[in-house]
Regions:
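Internal, hydrophobic beta-strand segments that form the core of beta-sheet-rich folds
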Residues: 124-140, 145-155
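Short coil-to-beta strand junction motifs in C2/discoidin
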Residues: 69-75, 145-147
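Post-signal peptide N-terminal segment of mature Sec-exported envelope proteins
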Residues: 28-50
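Short amphipathic, basic-aromatic surface patches that mediate peripheral association
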Residues: 60-67
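C-terminal motif of bacterial Sec signal peptides marking the signal peptidase cleavage site
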Residues: 16-19
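Bacterial N-terminal signal peptides that target proteins for export
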Residues: 1-8
Length: 157
């Protein structure tokens, strides 16, 4: 009976370990200048050149302070390979509810929200790698309160 309990515990532990595995292939944040995020400032993410081909689920992370004056943010995301643009998207992300409460969580005055994108990002093998560029499309030419922007890619199942 004791042997059965130990076997059961090992199987449960192995299952939990597999269930908690993170299959993220790329996860990086780029800081925004302390003077604000200017509309001409582009955040650049260089993906590893040896990423497996296939479709990737993408999440955009935004870290901001309460100084950010808007409930949402408009971003333009482009993905290039060998200086050829093959993906471009406009992202409309909500950072606060209609009541003005921040959607994300945080500590120390920094709020983080994660936004899953509906469209997968298709990648093929390449020697040079891919570059993702993100700029903001807000009417305000300089945004205050945005701390950094992140990109996370995981293989789509």
């Amino acid at each position: 009976m004791k042997h059965l309990r130990i076997t059961y515990a090992i199987v449960c532990l192995a299952w939990l370990t597999c269930a908690c595995q993170d299959n993220t292939k790329f996860h990086q944040y780029q800081p925004v200048k302390q003077t604000g995020w200017h509309s001409i400032d582009t955040l650049t993410f260089h993906l590893p050149s040896k990423m497996d081909s296939g479709e990737y689920d993408m999440q955009i992370g935004i870290r901001h302070t309460e100084k950010y004056a808007y409930q949402d943010i408009w971003l333009e995301m482009t993905c290039t390979c060998d200086s050829t643009m093959f993906a471009k998207d406009t992202l409309h992300l909500y950072l606060a509810t209609k009541n003005g409460e921040w959607s994300g969580r945080g500590i120390g005055g920094l709020i983080q929200s994660i936004h899953a994108q509906a469209k997968p990002l298709p990648l093929q093998p390449t020697e040079q790698g891919y570059i993702i560029r993100i700029t903001h499309l807000m009417n305000d030419s300089t945004l205050q309160g945005i701390h950094d922007i992140g990109v996370q890619l995981s293989p789509r199942h």
